[in-house]
């Protein structure tokens, strides 16, 4: 282990029994942890910026697996046709990846499907507020100062994205239809549970997971990867 890796201090957050996630800056991940050979090879043909977020997300996932006692070692992190990541060597584990403007996130669920999303706040059009939020919440958000409106909307949309990732549907799952009340830090939607960990994340993050027994080993569909 390198000296930088030995100084790695990120510790997983536990959303539920068997569901863990990590969020970190890409530069911190790549500065502290080695990139696995399969990930480096897979990123070889990508533009530099895309290769950085690709390898950072997968490196963070491998670190998360080690920290939770599920060390993947050099095993592959593959992607289904829709982009959803999975572990060919560990079909019992659901995984999810996300990246946004220098941040990466990874989640793992034992015997569950999981979805993770991270979003740096950005300008929000009035139409998007009306699409993703209840009329009351859209009105409240519109009245907020710009910076607050961007951040609060990002907390909502990360949960919506995480939910459709956990289902494996991606955008075809119409994330804007997932009801996420303004300011709420946890909730349920159909067979999913979700959390928006406002108290301990510096950037808006959403994590969603299924109940045990809902996991679909061969589940395809989209869901985005890093």
What are these regions (language model features)?
Residues 1-226:
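Core catalytic alpha/beta fold that binds nucleotide/phospho-ligands
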């Amino acid at each position: 282990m390198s000296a930088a890796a030995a100084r790695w201090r990120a510790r997983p957050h536990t959303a539920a029994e068997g569901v863990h996630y990590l969020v970190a800056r890409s530069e911190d991940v790549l500065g502290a942890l080695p990139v696995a050979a399969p990930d480096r090879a897979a990123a070889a043909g990508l533009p530099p910026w895309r290769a950085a977020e690709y390898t950072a997300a997968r490196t963070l996932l491998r670190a998360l697996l080690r920290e939770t006692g599920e060390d993947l070692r050099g095993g592959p992190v593959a992607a289904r046709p829709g982009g959803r990541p999975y572990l060919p060597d560990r079909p019992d584990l659901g995984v999810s990846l996300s990246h946004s403007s220098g941040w990466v996130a990874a989640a793992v669920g034992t015997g569950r499907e999981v979805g993770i999303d991270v979003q740096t706040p950005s300008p929000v059009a009035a139409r998007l507020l009306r699409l993703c939020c209840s009329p009351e919440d859209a009105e409240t958000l519109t009245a907020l100062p710009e910076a607050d409106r961007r951040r609060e909307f990002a907390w909502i949309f990360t949960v919506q994205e995480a939910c459709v990732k956990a289902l494996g549907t991606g955008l075809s799952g119409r994330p804007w239809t997932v009801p996420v009340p303004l300011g709420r830090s946890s909730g349920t939607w159909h067979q999913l549970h979700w959390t928006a960990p406002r108290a301990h994340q510096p950037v808006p993050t959403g994590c969603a997971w299924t109940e045990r027994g809902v996991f679909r080993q061969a589940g395809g569909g989209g869901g985005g990867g890093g």
